[in-house]
UniProtKB/Swiss-Prot annotation:
Belongs to the major facilitator superfamily. Sugar transporter (TC 2.A.1.1) family. This is Sugar transporter ERD6-like 17. The gene is SFP1. The lineage of its organism: Eukaryota, Viridiplantae, Streptophyta, Embryophyta, Tracheophyta. One of its GO terms (molecular function) is sugar transmembrane transporter activity. SUPFAM superfamilies: MFS general substrate transporter. The keyword Membrane applies. It comes from Arabidopsis thaliana (Mouse-ear cress).
């Protein structure tokens, strides 16, 4: 009986798909404002990501830290984010997307202020962990919120702005870290969180979360604000309600649901993308760019400043192309580019060690780091979060989102902590390992990652639910 009802609901959803509704194509001021407010947290996260690169010298000198202590400090943000990932999904479901961002702001502000006024390593590490927990919440809820409020034809572009603002924060830390103290940098990291706290009072809640909790009147009000007061929101509201009803009838939303046959594929895609994003070396290269430049004999000040200048235009490429080229082409281009640049970095440091053409190592390393960050920014930097926000149905989004976010930050913490030790063990070997993982990432994307460009969230989720059956038939 439930299966028959589920099929009839799916048929109704597919019929709704064939109807045109211009209201879904509108980009209103409310959508733009809501996205801007949401990505303020992403900017602060970007500052935290590059903070160890910009603050390394000052922190180690002022607080007399060893390499091991500073490596631990660097990894504590991702460790905290992994802790936040355990709660992000449930928190976002219980108190909503806006409420979760408020909680994140409180944690991030507390953490940044603790770092800024730290006189000893204990308070420094406390601030890093607490802010990390906040970033764990932000990294999940921001792309989910943006994906749930934006029209489908620009959803990728708007959701990718999450990565753009992370890169903006990264650019600021690379640029300002050359002449601003590490304590002032921490205060700058807290500023976007204060802006978000205020801005959240003026933006609507996610209509899909409102449908999940049964607030149909608030759902309509949210859609009217997002699509315009004169818009016909009936089709979109019906589609959201139909899909919500379908997944609720189909499942009790327990942890075991994740391992149902129809959801395994999406879980493999979500977790796989996060693993290859981190183990291809992104967190290490971004966090310790100054260390790489120093080892290569290239000017740290010039290298980080140039990264700061070019990191935003690089992300803009992905922002422009994500809804034109699609997710898969950008991801494959990104994985290939990251693999090749890591291979060349390994070659550069091999030449340096063998004292063969070692004069090429500084400039080759600089070019490779720049190209690595560029190819990372257009694809694997932001698209795993875009796809994560799209592929999970509302009934498993809580648990699946938490697991995927936990995997991301746990693996990032491992890579960030281990990098300095790997770098001392074998500089060139470290990058050859990253290159090999990048090659495996290319194969994974080609074989498994679906294209979601131009589809509504409901259309994506219906098609992916049937993906295992379609694969068995072929």
């Amino acid at each position: 009986m439930v299966m028959e009802e589920g099929r009839s609901i799916e048929e109704g959803l597919l019929q709704l798909k064939n109807k045109n509704d211009d209201s879904e194509c509108r980009i209103t001021a409310c959508v733009i404002l809501s996205t801007f407010v949401a990505v303020c947290g992403s900017f602060s996260f970007g500052v935290a990501t590059g903070y160890t690169s910009g603050a390394e010298t000052g922190v180690m000198k002022d607080l007399d830290l060893s390499i091991a202590q500073f490596s631990a400090f660097g990894s504590f943000a991702t460790l905290g984010a992994a802790i936040g990932a355990l709660f992000c999904g449930n928190l976002a479901m219980v108190i909503g997307r806006r409420g979760t961002m408020w909680v994140s702001d409180f944690l991030c502000i507390t953490g940044w202020l603790s770092i800024a006024f730290a006189k000893e390593v204990v308070l420094l590490n406390f601030g890093r962990i607490i802010s990390g927990i906040g970033f764990g919440l932000t990294s999940y809820v921001v792309p989910v919120y943006i994906a749930e409020i934006t029209p489908k034809h620009v959803r990728g572009t708007f959701t990718f702005s999450n990565q753009l603002l992370q890169n903006a924060g990264l650019a600021m830390i690379y640029f300002c870290g050359n002449f601003i103290t590490w304590r002032t940098l921490a205060l700058l990291g807290a500023l976007p969180c204060f802006i978000q706290v205020i801005g959240l009072f003026f933006v609507p809640e996610s209509p899909r979360w409102l449908a999940k909790v049964g607030s149909d009147k608030e759902l309509e009000n949210s859609l009217f604000r997002l699509r315009g007061r004169d818009a016909d929101i009936s089709r979109e509201a019906s589609e959201i309600q139909v899909m919500t009803k379908m997944v609720e009838n189909d499942s009790k939303s327990s942890f075991s649901d994740l391992f149902q046959r129809k959801y395994r594929y999406t879980l493999v895609v979500g977790i796989g993308l996060m693993l290859i994003q981190q183990f291809s070396g992104s967190a290490a290269v971004i966090s310790y760019a100054s260390t790489i430049f120093r080892k290569a004999g290239f000017s740290v000040a010039i290298g980080t400043t140039m990264l700061g200048i070019f990191v935003i235009p690089k992300a803009m490429i992905g922002l422009i192309l994500v809804d034109k080229w699609g997710r898969r082409p950008l991801l494959m281009t990104s994985a290939f580019g990251m693999s090749m640049t890591c291979m060349l970095l390994g070659v550069a440091f091999t030449l340096q060690k063998m004292q063969l053409l070692s004069e090429l190592t500084p400039i080759l390393s600089f070019i490779c780091v720049m190209m690595y960050i560029a190819t990372y920014a257009i694809g694997l930097g932001g698209l795993p979060w875009v796809i994560m926000s799209e592929i999970f149905p509302i009934n498993i989004k809580v648990t699946a989102g938490s697991i995927v976010t936990l995997v991301s930050f746990s693996s990032s913490s491992i890579v960030t902590y281990a990098f300095n030790f790997l770098f001392e063990w074998s500089t060139q070997g470290t990058f050859f390992i990253f290159a090999g993982i990048g090659g495996a990432a290319l194969l994974f994307i080609w074989l498994l990652v679906p294209e979601t460009k131009g589809l509504s969230l409901e259309e994506i989720q219906v098609s992916l639910i049937h993906q295992p059956d379609e694969r068995n038939q072929t």
